[in-house]
Amino acid sequence: MATFKDACYHYKRINKLNHTVLKLGVNDTWRSSPPTKYKGWCLDCCQHTDLTYCRGCTMYHVCQWCSQYGRCFLDNEPHLLRMRTFKNEVTKDDLKNLIDMYEILFPMNQKIVCRFINNTRQHKCRNECMTQWYNHLLLPITLQSMSIELDGDVYYVFGYYDNMNSINQTPFSFTNLVDIYDKLLLDDVNFARMSFLPASLQQEYALRYFSKSRFISEQRKCVNDSHFSINVLENLHNPSFKVQITRNCSELSFDWNEACKLVKNVSAYFDMLKTSHIEFYSVSTRCRIFTQCKLKMASKLIKPNYITSNHKTLATEVHNCKWCSVNNSYTVWNDFRIKKIYDNIFNFLRALVKSNVNIGHCSSQEKIYEYVEDVLNVCDDERWKTSIMEIFNCLEPVELDDVKYVLFNHEINWDVINVLVHSIGKVPQILTLENVITIMQSIIYEWFDIRYMRNTPMVTFTIDKLRRLHTGLKTVEYDSGISDIE
């Protein structure tokens, strides 16, 4: 049983404020939600279990029970998850406010302890205190958090997360902020709470506290496409696809890290809850993470033999050729931009090969093929440039004044001609390595200009950013045949 979840269940009965703040979906009637096999900690109830995707950010961070309330750590409504979420620079005063909130919501005194002990129905002698009966009293106050970095902003979701060594398939990593506060001050807070417990429970409380307050922070994870809902990934091939998200909002006027102070003024807190509402947004999937996902999918389907072939058709339109025919049944080809990039890249590469190397048929086995497999993966800059350099070297370049040149005198299509004119100002007869890199980047950047793309999708934006973009009609950046350059 998750300690934080149990504490919320029992403590929500002590007053009206707690009944509102500590209400968790996991402690209420179960409602069905999409099942998944992702393992990790639910940010809402802090238990380690199977996770489903959040309706606010499409990432996997909520359990199937808590998903019924649709809470996200990026919300603007002061629910418990939002009040436990801190952003970027966290100060000692911020952590003091967090500890004060814990003390208000989970008080520990003689009256509370006696009340819980008397209300507990034990199956053995009442004089014997067992941890499974009093799990809710064994919630220490720690500065343990799950952190994530989203486009330069770092979020810390504080809580009490059991079983830290369990499988974690989420983009969140454990971070300990006790050094920002003060170990001794935090010790005093917990020793004072522990003193009200029966002697048989004090040792367990101490073990839990020290294990969660003295651990070494994990290295922060990189967010990738696998951390987002499979429903989003399955529709990436559609250029006009928009992600539907919902956010819980209110007229929250505090600074981000001061939301936890709201519980100190109960009447003001309930007044703010009266302004709570749900906002709906349709946002674009355009970002580096999803772009790299699509380009990698296309890279797996590459037929490098086309660059030595004599086919009169475009690379994606070759049929009945054992070495060059692309399997068009994959959904990645439904995105016309991917097909354009693939056709133009291979039209340009074939012109380079035919201009410099005497290879007459696509059935021949050439060393250059092994370097062609990475020509679409421009998001991995170092690996991509290495593959282009190896391709260039396979063309047997001529060195003149420490600069290597290759010929370029084979026919190309009109799309590639336009790219050449825009990128280097003319259709040249010779090319350097830098020219080749520039041209191939331009072919890809025409449709996916990753230089100006955010890393994560807009679903990870805060409410303030979403509102500003919505006002400027920029939340839906779908393409109707319009490229990045246009």
UniProtKB/Swiss-Prot annotation:
Lineage: superkingdom: Viruses
Positions of the UniProt region annotated as RNA-binding: 1-81
Keywords associated with the record: Host cytoplasm, Host cytoskeleton, Host-virus interaction, Inhibition of host innate immune response by virus, Inhibition of host IRF3 by virus, Inhibition of host IRF7 by virus, Inhibition of host NF-kappa-B by virus, Inhibition of host RLR pathway by virus, Interferon antiviral system evasion, Metal-binding, Phosphoprotein, RNA-binding, Viral immunoevasion
Primary location: host cell
CC terms in the record's Gene Ontology section: host cell cytoplasm; host cytoskeleton
TM region positions: none
Residues covered by region (Important for cytoskeleton localization): 82-176
Residues forming coiled coils: none
Spans annotated as Zinc-binding domain: 42-79
InterPro entries attached to this UniProt entry: Rotavirus_NSP1
Keyword RNA-binding applies: yes
PTM remark: The C-terminal region is phosphorylated by host CKII/CSNK2A1. Phosphorylation of the DSGXS motif is essential for host NF-kappa-B inhibition.
Functional description taken from the UniProt entry: Plays a role in the inhibition of host innate immunity by inducing the degradation of key host factors required to activate interferon production such as IRF3, IRF5 or IRF7. Associates with components of cullin RING ligases (CRLs) including CUL1 or CUL3, which are essential multisubunit ubiquitination complexes, to modulate their activities. Recognizes the host NF-kappa-B regulator BTRC through the presence of a DSGXS motif in the C-terminal substrate recognition domain.
Protein name: Non-structural protein 1
